[in-house]
Each structure stands twice: as structure tokens, then as C-alpha cells.
């Protein structure tokens, strides 16, 4: 059986927070606001994987009302999701994602993001693809008010 899931996440850019995307801390004057580390890419991937497995979403598994997830490392949450999906008999075939950001430029960090995310799911780097694009100055992303991410995951059983 093959299952496909999609995930989407956005977070607001604010001062005095680190900018963590795909488990990589990027040098930038703002970071993403959230209960956890607000890693928008990893959150979208988590939702894509959970959706494909029919296991709910990130908010159900790691609610922001639970203090144990305050400032949580999202890559560690992804590891837990991978374990949960594995216990359900699924393996991840591949993950494909797109980061939506006006700034900073993502290209220098994509290889490290792929490595982090692949390792956390016990995948080969070739099973994870990450792209980045701008919103051509339109909307909240284009106005540099936030960053978004879209992910698709293929699971096999």
C-alpha cells in the first residue's frame, strides 16, 4: 500500500528568536515565533508524514498547551513521528518540500537541512528534497512578516 500526505505550516518572523529551519540555525536578525523552536519546514514534514499514515497532525501529537513541548527541538519531534509511523507498519519512501521565504536566502543551507531531516527519519539524503522560493514581494511572506513551508511525504506499507 502506498499513501501520500501533505503538510503546510507558517510562522511569524519576530525579533529576539533564533531562525531554525530544517534543524539548521540560520544567521538572521529575526526568528520564527512559536511554542516549540518554530521550525516551519520540519513542522510541515511532520504533518505530511502523519497525514499519509492517517495519524492526525502535529497539534494533536504535540499540543502547544503542553509545557513539555515549550522550545522543543522540532527535529527531535520528527524522530518521534518517524518511530510512531514505523510502529504502524509504514516506511517513508520520500519527502519533497518547498520553503516560502523572501529572506534569508536558503540555498546555502539546503544541503545541511536535507542531511538533518534524512538522518532523523533514517533515510538516504536522496530521499529528501528541499526547494526554496520567494513570494515575489506579495503577501505576508513577501513582506518579510513570516516564512512558510509545504511538504509531501510518500509512505509505503
Swiss-Prot record:
**Could you provide one GO biological process annotation from this protein's UniProt record?**
isopentenyl diphosphate biosynthetic process, methylerythritol 4-phosphate pathway
Per the annotation, how and in what number is the cofactor bound?
Binds 1 divalent metal cation per subunit.
Metal-binding as a keyword of this entry, yes or no, is yes
Pathway field: Isoprenoid biosynthesis; isopentenyl diphosphate biosynthesis via DXP pathway; isopentenyl diphosphate from 1-deoxy-D-xylulose 5-phosphate: step 4/6
The UniProt keyword set, sorted, is:
Isoprene biosynthesis, Lyase, Metal-binding
**Entry binding sites for a divalent metal cation:** 9, 11, 43
- Binding of 4-CDP-2-C-methyl-D-erythritol 2-phosphate: at which residues? 9-11, 35-36, 57-59, 62-66, 133-136, 140, 143
Recorded GO terms, molecular function?
A: 2-C-methyl-D-erythritol 2,4-cyclodiphosphate synthase activity; metal ion binding
CDD domains named among the record's database cross-references: MECDP_synthase
Q: Where is this site: Transition state stabilizer?
A: 35, 134
EC nos: 4.6.1.12
What domain of life is recorded for the organism?
Bacteria
Name the needed cofactors: a divalent metal cation
Asked if the keyword Lyase belongs to this entry, the reply reads yes
Q: Which reaction does it catalyse?
A: 4-CDP-2-C-methyl-D-erythritol 2-phosphate = 2-C-methyl-D-erythritol 2,4-cyclic diphosphate + CMP
Task: Give the main EC class.
Answer: lyase
Question: What Gene3D superfamilies does the database record attribute to this sequence?
Answer: 2-C-methyl-D-erythritol 2,4-cyclodiphosphate synthase
Quaternary assembly: Homotrimer.
Q: Its biological function?
A: Involved in the biosynthesis of isopentenyl diphosphate (IPP) and dimethylallyl diphosphate (DMAPP), two major building blocks of isoprenoid compounds. Catalyzes the conversion of 4-diphosphocytidyl-2-C-methyl-D-erythritol 2-phosphate (CDP-ME2P) to 2-C-methyl-D-erythritol 2,4-cyclodiphosphate (ME-CPP) with a corresponding release of cytidine 5-monophosphate (CMP).
Q: Which family is annotated?
A: Belongs to the IspF family.
Database matches in PANTHER family = 2-C-METHYL-D-ERYTHRITOL 2,4-CYCLODIPHOSPHATE SYNTHASE, CHLOROPLASTIC
Name recorded for this polypeptide: 2-C-methyl-D-erythritol 2,4-cyclodiphosphate synthase
Q: Which gene encodes it?
A: ispF
Amino acid at each position: 500500500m502506498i499513501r501520500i500526505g501533505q503538510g503546510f505550516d507558517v510562522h511569524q518572523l519576530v525579533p529576539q528568536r533564533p531562525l531554525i529551519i530544517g534543524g539548521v540555525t540560520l544567521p538572521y536578525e529575526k526568528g520564527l515565533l512559536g511554542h516549540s523552536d518554530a521550525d516551519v519546514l520540519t513542522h510541515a514534514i511532520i504533518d505530511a508524514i502523519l497525514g499519509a499514515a492517517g495519524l492526525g497532525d502535529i497539534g494533536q501529537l504535540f499540543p502547544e498547551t503542553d509545557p513539555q513541548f515549550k522550545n522543543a527541538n522540532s527535529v527531535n519531534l520528527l524522530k518521534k513521528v518517524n518511530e510512531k509511523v514505523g510502529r504502524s507498519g509504514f516506511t517513508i519512501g520520500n519527502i519533497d518540500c518547498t520553503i516560502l521565504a523572501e529572506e534569508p536566502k536558503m540555498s546555502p543551507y539546503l544541503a545541511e537541512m536535507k542531511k538533518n531531516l534524512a538522518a532523523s527519519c533514517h533515510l538516504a539524503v536522496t530521499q529528501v528534497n528541499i526547494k526554496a522560493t520567494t513570494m515575489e514581494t506579495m503577501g505576508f511572506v513577501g513582506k518579510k512578516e513570516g516564512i512558510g513551508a509545504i511538504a509531501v511525504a510518500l509512505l509505503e506499507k
